[in-house]
């Protein structure tokens, strides 16, 4: 598999983990005013992969990644929403799909979600484990104009946050691709041997705006699984 990962890196971009420290965003308090807005390029997505790393003591539901489109009923175009200790909801075009997952433990969690609008195939990976695949009802693409928020759940385009859905903890390595990332590269993301840069949004090179009292910690290191 190592050879496949190196081949992927040559064409799609990545760097060896450990060469530089990680940028971590710390969400220190329960509030409806602290969040991060990601600013990817605007284009239509027929496929998507979202990968992120999170670390929290929360034992209640919370929003990690919220992608909304403009218009009625499009606030949960893609939502990653854990229900600790052992459930998570992935929403696609406001269809909530629930997964039973391994119980939460107090460690960094790696989460990847992939979706293909042509087939409706939805895949959830957590800490290297692929959970039973699902098929969504929607076959509509995502975009082109989207709002992407970390740490809050959008009930309208770009806002209408609920304090009871807020994330408290740390987040890092949020990357988005405009295709379904192959399993060998998802496993590489979990292994931390390589950091794969998203071609739609890259944590290391993407634009973002911090709102509220979020603390940016640079040159940090995240323990391996």
Swiss-Prot record:
Keyword Metal-binding recorded: yes
Disulfide bonds: 51-112
Post-translational modification: Glycosylated.
Residues where Ca(2+) 1 binds: 75-76, 153-155
MF GO annotations: carbohydrate binding; galactoside binding; metal ion binding
Annotated residues for binding of Ca(2+) 2: 153, 155, 165
Subcellular location: Secreted
Cofactor (UniProt): Ca(2+)
SUPFAM superfamilies: Concanavalin A-like lectins/glucanases (SSF49899)
Expressing tissues: Oviduct. Highest expression levels were detected in the pars convoluta with lower levels detected in the pars recta. No expression was detected in the pars uterina.
Main location: secreted
Sugar-bearing residue positions: 87, 207
UniProt keyword annotations, A-Z: Calcium, Disulfide bond, Glycoprotein, Lectin, Metal-binding, Secreted, Signal
GO cellular component: extracellular region
PROSITE patterns reported in the protein's UniProt record: PTX_2 (PS51828)
Signal peptide: 1-19
Cofactor mode of binding and number, as noted: Binds 2 calcium ions per subunit.
Domain Pentraxin (PTX) residue range list: 21-223
InterPro entries from the UniProt entry: ConA-like_dom_sf, Pentraxin-related, Pentraxin_domain
Transmembrane parts of this sequence: none
Known function: Calcium-dependent beta-galactose specific lectin.
Subunit structure: Homodecamer consisting of two homopentamer units. Pentraxin (or pentaxin) have a discoid arrangement of 5 non-covalently bound subunits.
PANTHER family the UniProt entry points to: C-REACTIVE PROTEIN, C-REACTIVE PROTEIN-RELATED
Family: Belongs to the pentraxin family.
Name this polypeptide is given: Jeltraxin
Source species: Lepidobatrachus laevis (Budgett's frog)
């Amino acid at each position: 598999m190592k050879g496949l990962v190196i081949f992927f890196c040559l064409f799609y971009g990545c760097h060896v983990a450990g060469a530089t420290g990680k940028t971590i965003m710390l969400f220190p308090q329960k509030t409806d005013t602290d969040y991060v807005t990601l600013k990817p390029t605007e284009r239509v997505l027929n496929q998507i992969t979202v990968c992120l790393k999170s670390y929290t003591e929360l034992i209640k539901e919370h929003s990690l990644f919220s992608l909304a489109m403009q218009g009625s009923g499009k606030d949960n175009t893609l939502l990653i929403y854990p229900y600790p200790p052992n459930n998570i909801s992935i929403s696609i075009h406001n269809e909530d799909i629930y997964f039973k997952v391994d119980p939460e433990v107090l460690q960094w969690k790696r989460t990847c979600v992939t979706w293909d609008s042509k087939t409706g195939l939805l895949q959830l990976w957590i800490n290297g484990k692929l959970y039973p695949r699902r098929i969504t009802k929607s076959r509509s693409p995502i975009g082109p104009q989207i709002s992407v928020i970390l740490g809050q759940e959008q009930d309208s385009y770009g806002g209408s946050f609920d304090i009871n859905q807020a994330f408290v903890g740390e987040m890092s390595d949020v990357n988005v691709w405009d295709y379904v990332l192959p399993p060998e590269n998802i496993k590489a993301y979990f292994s931390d041997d390589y950091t794969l840069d998203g071609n739609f949004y890259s944590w290391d090179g993407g634009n973002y705006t911090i709102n509220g009292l979020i603390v940016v910690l640079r040159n940090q290191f995240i323990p391996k699984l």
